[in-house]
Regions:
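Positively charged, low-complexity intrinsically disordered leader regions
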Residues: 1-17
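Conserved N-terminal subdomain of the carbohydrate kinase-like
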Residues: 14-20, 42-125, 300, 304-326
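Conserved beta-alpha-beta core of the PfkB/ribokinase-like small-molecule kinase fold
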Residues: 120, 125-200
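Conserved post-catalytic alpha-helical subdomain immediately downstream of the catalytic base
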Residues: 236-321
Length: 326
């Protein structure tokens, strides 16, 4: 079976409501998407870093419990695993996020996972735009491109981290160029291209290498932009009560759909609008499942059904490819 390689931050989020802590959970769309994908029976590796402290143990244990391969997580003995305190906004206000972290000088010294043709590499977060992790991360991403993998990029970074977007804009544009598929939310796009509509941002910055862009919004259906193609799903995008679960689930569902429908790097460009709608249907279904979950991942029952469907479908693909033609 083809593999998923997820490259992103390891962070523990703590949610506060009315100034009081409500719960702590593993943060990040990439880590949570990896957990769902592995739970659905797909070989999934997480490439990341965290300290050997108790917080790092919580994150690694969470991934292990969901069957994620954690051998490519660099456990540094100096410093502390990142923490994010999320203070829920009230009366329509945005959440306020305070980030904590203490890092060693030598970072992201990870063990590279095996990457084969048509594997799927998912990357994004602060690692993909800021030094010192970016240089090593992009070495791995460029290697994945050389190996013939499908590369999926999630622009944006942890809200609450402040730096001038102009400083990292060349890195963002390079990431957009190397990716086969880009998935971003309204807020991500507004922070990166604040004075442009979605259509303008796609035309001016994304639509250069034949890649596909999937746009998520709190107020509209997920929409595909690819060349002159436009396709959308008929439901509102995000569950406002669990944005992390929804977006992580959508990402996991889209990658699952690529495997289910046997979408490879070679035939991705030929995928028509109806084909993209099938992928979006699968992604939204998984997103709704994860948004309803307390740990932002698919349930055991959902995972079992998805794994069985994928296994049976792959067996049919294999049988049809080996059956002699008359």
């Amino acid at each position: 079976m083809r593999k998923i390689i997820a490259i992103g931050e390891s962070v523990l989020d703590t949610l506060f409501h009315h100034g009081k802590p409500v719960k702590a959970f593993v943060g990040g769309r990439i880590a949570n998407a990896a957990a769902s994908l592995a739970t659905m029976g797909i070989p999934t590796s997480m490439v990341s870093e965290c300290s050997t402290d108790c917080v790092g143990d919580i994150i690694v244990d969470f991934l292990k419990a969901h069957n994620v391969d954690v051998r490519s997580i660099d456990r540094y003995p100096d410093g502390a695993t990142p923490l994010a305190a999320i203070f829920q906004g009230e009366n329509g206000q945005r959440d306020s996020i305070v980030n904590y972290g203490n890092y060693p000088n030598d970072r992201f010294d990870v063990l590279w996972p095996t990457i084969d043709h048509d594997d799927i590499v998912l990357f994004g977060s602060l690692y993909s735009v800021d030094l010192p992790q970016r240089e090593r991360l992009m070495d791995l991403v460029n290697y994945a491109v050389e190996r013939g993998a499908i590369v999926v990029y999630l622009p944006g970074f942890q809200h609450g981290i402040s730096f001038r977007i102009t400083r990292v804009m060349p890195n963002v544009l390079e990431n957009l160029e190397v990716a086969s598929i880009i998935i971003a939310h309204d807020r991500d796009l507004q922070e990166i291209f604040p004075d442009e509509t979605v259509e303008e941002a796609f035309v001016h910055h994304i639509n250069f290498s034949g890649n596909a862009y999937v746009h998520l919004s709190d107020s509209a259906a997920p929409k595909l932009y690819r060349g002159t193609q436009r396709a959308s799903h008929g439901t509102v995008s995000t569950d406002s009560h669990n944005r992390l679960g929804w977006q992580a689930g959508f990402t996991a569902g889209l990658l699952y759909a690529l495997l289910l429908h046997d979408i490879t790097r070679d035939n991705l460009a030929a995928l028509d609008t109806d084909g993209w709608r099938q992928l979006l249907d699968c992604a939204v279904d998984c997103a709704q499942e994860c948004a309803a979950s307390s740990d932002n991942c698919v349930s055991a029952d959902y995972a079992t059904r998805a794994a069985t469907r994928l296994r049976d479908t792959l067996a049919q693909h294999q049988e049809s490819s080996t059956t002699p033609q008359p």
